[in-house]
């Protein structure tokens, strides 16, 4: 490559696709609850020369030389995330939320042990025991469900199942549950049966960091999370605990247990995101995320849609589309055609095939990052409603989205 030749002109195929993706993000409405937009600083750190450095091990205990700088980078990420969540110990090396969960399982329980987690169709996650996932293949899984009338987690049912099955681990956490989680109640039940309480806060980590959702750490033995979603960081995982002995076991499970060299450029980006989340303005952001989700839920109810559990306490809501004669797959296609991105969702006690889902999950982290507030949720609900009814609203979506710049 000559000094005058840029990477974009050398590999036009990839960089043209990157430009197309940037335009897709700019001109559309991103309502996938697990997606967000990072700051330019996060992207710059992730695209830095740190990607060149191999650093098996942990700060001060590496297998390779030349790690004195990345040691400081990783330690800064550790220190910041501990401050953010009030943790005594942290591991910032997991490549994803699922790999963080895998490390927790491998470190703390044995194959064949019983795990009590939220049923996927009721709002849980694949790694909480779904039979197609490692968690469902390696462990004996007992699923708890929401109350059929309130669609809230019924702690009396959780307690009954815990005493009946005596799990080694109880998982508190979800990927499509719109209400606050009572971590204190989960810990009380875990103590009654001698179980480890594992909190998966991947979706609500940013809300917890901002003080807008109860913190899991005073109650859970171990906490894992992604670093994107409501935290607005790069795609990756973290594990936290106030128990240093458990932390040491998990460190060994991450390395050398199942990962080799950590991605220090991603860890640097995590550190930047943690620093941003420690600023006062992040609290304002998290508060607005929730306000927007609640406003969006009300806007859909006003248009005749049923919102699962009747509303939301966090960043997401689930719409039941059965009364509209739609399922998640059909709705996703109609909205995609209008540059509105969402994810299909299963519904509690639904008979629709899990591949299609009876509803859709909507989240407000990304649109809030772009500066949208409650008044704009009415516009979004109107655009979605009309698109679901078969209208072409693509031009309106582009015009509306163009008013809100990406970070």
Curated annotation (Swiss-Prot):
Biological process terms in GO annotation: glycine biosynthetic process from serine; tetrahydrofolate interconversion
Cofactor: pyridoxal 5'-phosphate
Positions with a binding annotation for (6S)-5,6,7,8-tetrahydrofolate: 120, 124-126
Top-rank lineage group of the source organism: Bacteria
GO molecular function, one term: glycine hydroxymethyltransferase activity
PANTHER family: SERINE HYDROXYMETHYLTRANSFERASE, SERINE HYDROXYMETHYLTRANSFERASE 1
Subunit structure as annotated in this protein's UniProt entry: Homodimer.
Name of protein: Serine hydroxymethyltransferase
């Amino acid at each position: 490559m000559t000094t005058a030749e840029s990477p974009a002109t050398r590999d036009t195929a990839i960089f043209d696709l990157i430009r197309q993706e940037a335009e897709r993000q700019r001109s559309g409405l991103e309502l996938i609850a697990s997606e967000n937009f990072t700051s330019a600083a996060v992207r710059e750190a992730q695209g830095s020369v740190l990607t060149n450095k191999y650093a098996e091990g942990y700060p001060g205990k590496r297998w390779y030389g030349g790690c004195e700088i990345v040691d400081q980078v990783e330690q800064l990420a550790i220190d910041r995330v501990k401050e953010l969540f009030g943790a005594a110990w942290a591991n910032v090396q997991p490549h994803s939320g699922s790999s963080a969960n895998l490390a927790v399982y491998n470190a703390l329980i044995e194959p064949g042990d019983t795990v009590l987690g939220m049923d996927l169709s009721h709002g849980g996650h694949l790694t909480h025991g779904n039979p197609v996932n490692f968690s469902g293949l390696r462990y004996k899984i007992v699923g708890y469900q929401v109350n059929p009338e309130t669609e809230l987690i019924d702690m009396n049912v959780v307690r009954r199942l815990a005493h009946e099955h005596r799990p080694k681990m109880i998982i508190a956490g979800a990927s499509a549950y719109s209400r606050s989680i009572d971590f204190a109640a989960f810990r009380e039940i875990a103590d009654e049966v001698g179980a480890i309480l594992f909190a998966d806060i991947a979706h609500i980590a940013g809300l917890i960091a901002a003080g807008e959702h109860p913190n899991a750490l005073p109650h859970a033995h171990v906490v894992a999370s992604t670093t994107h979603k409501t935290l607005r960081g790069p795609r990756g995982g973290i594990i936290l605990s106030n128990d240093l002995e458990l932390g040491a076991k998990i460190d060994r499970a991450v390395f050398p247990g199942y990962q080799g060299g950590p991605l220090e450029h991603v860890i640097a980006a995590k550190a930047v995101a943690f620093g941003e989340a420690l600023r006062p303005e992040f609290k304002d952001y998290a508060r607005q995320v929730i306000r927007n989700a609640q406003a969006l839920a009300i806007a859909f109810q006003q248009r005749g849609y049923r919102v699962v559990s009747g509303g939301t306490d966090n960043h997401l809501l689930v719409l039941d589309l059965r009364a509209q004669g739609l399922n998640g797959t059909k709705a996703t296609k109609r909205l995609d055609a209008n540059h509105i991105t969402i994810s299909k969702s299963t519904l509690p006690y639904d008979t629709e095939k899990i591949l299609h889902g009876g509803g859709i999950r909507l989240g407000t982290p990304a649109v809030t990052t772009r500066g949208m507030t409650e008044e704009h949720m009415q516009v979004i609900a109107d655009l979605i409603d009309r698109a679901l009814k078969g209208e072409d609203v693509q031009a309106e979506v582009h015009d509306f989205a163009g008013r809100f710049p990406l970070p």
